[in-house]
Design a protein with these regions (language model features):
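Domain-level signal for soluble alpha/beta catalytic cores
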Residues: 1-302
Length: 302
């Protein structure tokens, strides 16, 4: 999966994000579009060198109906972001999947402003339908901090019939921000959907924290081991509270980071490896090298 976009766009390219839509409007700016092409191009080159399938997601986590209205925009922003990434896919020459990124209504790190399940269904239904109409290959619900909102979003995507992944905001204690265990969250969402998520993941968290979370006794269940399949990881072992608003990134060295990622191989179905805050092409290259070293010349599939 792709590595960091947002932090790199700010720190390496000096780009400012929209107050309502964050990165979703960058495709309309020459500098923003060029930076996105360059970052994705670098990640694609790594996937090509190591013969790995590649997943990328539109920078649209904040592009929900409420925020689009506040920005005086429409769902065309979603369609244009999917089309932009689709063009990159067509020119990539690799096995690549275009994901539509969705997110929670409120704060992904604290859970503040999170929606109850039925309200979440109504809130996310429109966004999911926009991605269906735009033709994304799958939907990716990133850093979901609470079970009720994640469940409501899953129900909304369930209605579209699209493939999708739910990625939780998790802590070392093995729970989401609202206190739901990973196991309970997976079991509950699977129980209320006909078109179940392809799998579950976590993102914006260090692999050592994810390992502690998954290793909690109440998460060492058949459903977690079968259904939890990936991580899009931070390079810093700091907690969400410590990371949020940090002036400086706390970055692990690429090789050390890749070693920490591979320790998640204890969990048998973890097969989606991506980067979040602090990662760049060096980190993703070391991860790809580790994956290829582990599997030899075997053709890998998602």
């Amino acid at each position: 999966m792709e590595g960091a976009l947002g932090e790199r766009l700010k720190r390496e390219y000096g780009l400012a994000f929209d107050e309502h839509l964050a990165m979703a409007r960058l495709i309309y700016q020459p500098e923003g579009a060029a930076a996105l092409r360059e970052l994705w191009g670098g990640y694609i080159d790594i996937a090509r060198r190591y013969a790995l399938p590649f997943m990328a997601t539109t920078p649209t986590r904040r592009a929900n109906r409420e925020r689009l209205a506040a920005a005086n925009s429409t769902g065309q922003v979603i369609a244009d972001n999917v089309a932009f990434l689709r063009e990159i896919q067509k020119n990539s020459g690799i096995e690549m999947y275009v994901g539509g990124l969705m997110g929670c209504r409120g704060d992904a790190y604290t859970g503040e402003g999170a929606l109850p399940e039925d309200e979440a269904l109504e809130f996310h239904r429109w966004t999911a339908e926009q991605f269906r109409c735009a033709g994304a290959d799958f939907l990716y619900a990133g850093i979901m901090p609470t079970l009720p909102e994640a469940a409501g979003l899953a129900r909304a995507v369930d209605e579209t019939g699209m493939a999708y992944i739910i990625s939780f905001t998790i802590q070392a204690d093995g729970k989401l921000i609202d206190g739901a265990t990973i196991s309970d969250a997976v079991e509950y969402i699977d129980s209320i959907t006909d078109n179940k998520p392809l799998c579950y993941m976590t993102n914006c968290v260090h692999p050592s924290i994810a390992a502690k979370a998954l290793g909690q006794e109440f998460n060492r269940t058949a459903c977690v081991w079968k259904r939890f399949c990936g991580i899009q990881a931070n390079t810093s072992p700091l907690s969400y509270a410590e990371l949020d608003g940090a002036e400086d990134l706390h970055c692990s060295e690429p090789e050390e980071f890749a070693e920490e990622m591979m320790k998640l191989g204890e969990f048998p179905n973890v097969r989606i490896w991506g980067g979040c805050c602090g990662t760049d092409h060096r980190h993703m290259e070391h991860i790809a090298k580790k994956i290829r070293g582990r599997h030899g010349e075997k053709q890998l599939q998602l």
